Amino acid sequence: LSGVGVVYKFLVGMTENELEHYLDLVAIGCIADIMDIHDKEVGYLVHKGLKNIRNEFFKEILKDFDLNDITPETISFNLANIINGTIRFGSMEECELLFKALIGEEEEFEYKPRKSKNNPNPQVQIETLQQHMVRIAKSVKQKQDKKKKECIKLCEKYIEENNCNDSKVLTIIDEERKLVDKRITG
C-alpha cells in the first residue's frame, strides 16, 4: 500500500466512523503512486474508490477533461498528472489553493475568459474554487511541459556536443542543475 492506503487502514482501525466516502482519495493516491492494482487489497480499494468519486475537485477535473470512462489509466494520465504538476511546478499560493480545493473548501472567484472570434466580449463569470483550481492546474502543467521540452533540448545538445550519440547506455550527471530543473525530476 502507498501512504494514502496506510493512513486509510489506520483510520479504519482507529474509528467507528464510516470512512468509505474517502475511498476516492485513496484510489487516486494509490494510482498516482503507481501502486500495483493487481494486489488484492490495492485493487479492491482502487475499484471501490473509482466507483464512487465524491471529491468535488476530482469531479471538476474529470468534467473538464470530459472523462466518462474512469479507469486507472485516465486517472493517471489526466487527474494525477495535473495535480502532480501543480505540486512540483506551482507557486506556494497555487499549492495552497490546490490543497483547499482537495479538502472541499468553498470559495468563489471571478474569471473573465479570453476574447475569441466566437466570444469577442466575454463576460465575467463566477467559478468555484474547484473550477478555478482546475484552470490553474492545467496552466501550471502546460508551463511544466514547456520547461520539460526545454530540458530535453538541453540534454540533446549536451549529448551531441560531448559525442555521446553512439552510447548504448547514457547517464547525464547534472549536479549543478544546468540541464534539468529539479521541479521536473522530483
Predicted regions span which residues?
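Hydrophobic, small-residue-rich alpha-helical packing segments that form membrane-like cores
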Residues: 1-4
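Hydrophobic helix-and-loop "lid/oligomerization" segment in the mid-to-C-terminal part
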Residues: 15-186
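A charged, well-structured terminal subsegment
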Residues: 7-17
